[in-house]
Amino acid sequence: MATWNSRGLRGSALEELINFTNDTYLKNHLALIQKIPTPITPMKIDRETRHITLAYFDKKSTVDYIGVIQGIPVCFDAKETAVDTFPLQNIHAHQISFMSDFEQQKGIAFIILHYTARNEYYYLPYCDIIKFWERSEKGVHSFPTRRSSEIGRASCRERV
C-alpha cells in the first residue's frame, strides 16, 4: 500500500509548472482547471510542525486535474519519467476507465508527460494512451521518447 512517504507523493516540478500555468490561465479568463487532491487518511502527524508524516490513501484517485478551457471540458494527469522510456505501470486501470468515461461525455482526456533527463514535455491524447495500454496487456510495458514525439504531432480527432 502506498503511503505519504512514497516517491509518487512528493510533488514534482511538472505539477508546479502546471499549477502556475493554470493560475495564469485563470487570471486571464482563459481556463478554469483545478488540481484534484488525493483523498488520504493521516496516520502520523508531527506535533511540532503539524505536518502529516504518514498517511494512507482512502480510495483510488481519478486524474490530477479537471477543468474547462473556453467551454471545453478537460481532464488530465501529469506523469514524469527519468529514463528514455515511459513505463505504462505508471498509468492505473482506474485512470484509464475515468478518462474513457470522460471522453464518452465529449470531454478531452490526456496526459502531460515529462522526460526529466531530456527536459522534454509531451501531450498524449487519450486515444493514443489507450493504444499503448492495450499493447501493455499483450506484454509491451513501455514506450520510448521517440514514440511520444510522433504522438504529439496530430490529435486523434484530426486523424479520424
Stretches found by the model and what they are:
Residues 143-148, 158-160:
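Short, small-residue-biased leader/transition segments that mark boundaries at the very start
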Residues 1-56:
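Acidic-basic catalytic patches of nuclease active cores, encompassing PD-(D/E)XK
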Residues 42-43, 82-86, 119:
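Short, solvent-exposed loop/turn segments at secondary-structure junctions
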Residues 125-142:
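Short, electropositive alpha-helical surface patch
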Residues 79-98, 102-105:
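Mg2+/Mn2+-dependent nuclease catalytic core
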Residues 65-83:
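Conserved catalytic cores of phosphodiester-cleaving nucleases, focusing on short active-site segments
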Residues 100-130:
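Nucleic-acid nuclease catalytic cores
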Residues 58-62, 69-73, 104-106:
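Short connector loops at helix/strand junctions that flank enzyme active sites
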